[in-house]
């Protein structure tokens, strides 16, 4: 017997950064295309981490409840001065 295929994508973006789909539409398309799980990792700088993650969490929760797919909200930190990377990453983890 062949193992069940599991398909995940942990590096996706929505129109909240440089993607073209809303978070819920990105998730819906992943479900339709047979994905087992997803992470949404929109680009963000030092500002805006908390509002972005709050927005993503809501759609991730809806996806889990309605479609049974685990979706993990995250951020991809971009264009930060090197001295801010550590503290900004900690803020993202704490958010």
Which residues make up each language-model segment?
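A broad, low-specificity signal for short, low-complexity segments enriched in glycine/proline
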Residues: 1-2, 33-36, 59-63
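Catalytic core of pol beta-like nucleotidyltransferases
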Residues: 1, 22, 71
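Acidic-and-aromatic substrate-binding clefts and catalytic sites of carbohydrate-active enzymes
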Residues: 18-19, 46-51, 79-83
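Extended substrate/RNA-proximal surfaces in nucleic-acid metabolism proteins
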Residues: 53-95
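Divalent metal-dependent hydrolysis catalytic cores, especially in the metallo-beta-lactamase
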Residues: 9, 27-50, 68-76, 95
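Short, acidic/polar
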Residues: 19-30, 81-91
């Amino acid at each position: 017997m062949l193992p069940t295929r599991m398909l995940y994508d942990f590096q996706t973006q929505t129109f909240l950064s440089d993607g073209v789909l809303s978070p819920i539409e990105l998730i819906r398309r992943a479900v339709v295309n047979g994905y087992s799980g997803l992470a949404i990792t929109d680009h963000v700088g030092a500002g805006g981490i908390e509002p972005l993650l709050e927005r993503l969490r809501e759609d991730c929760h809806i996806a889990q409840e309605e479609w049974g797919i685990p979706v993990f909200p995250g951020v991809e930190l971009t264009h930060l001065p090197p001295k801010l990377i550590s503290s900004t990453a900690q803020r993202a983890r704490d958010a």
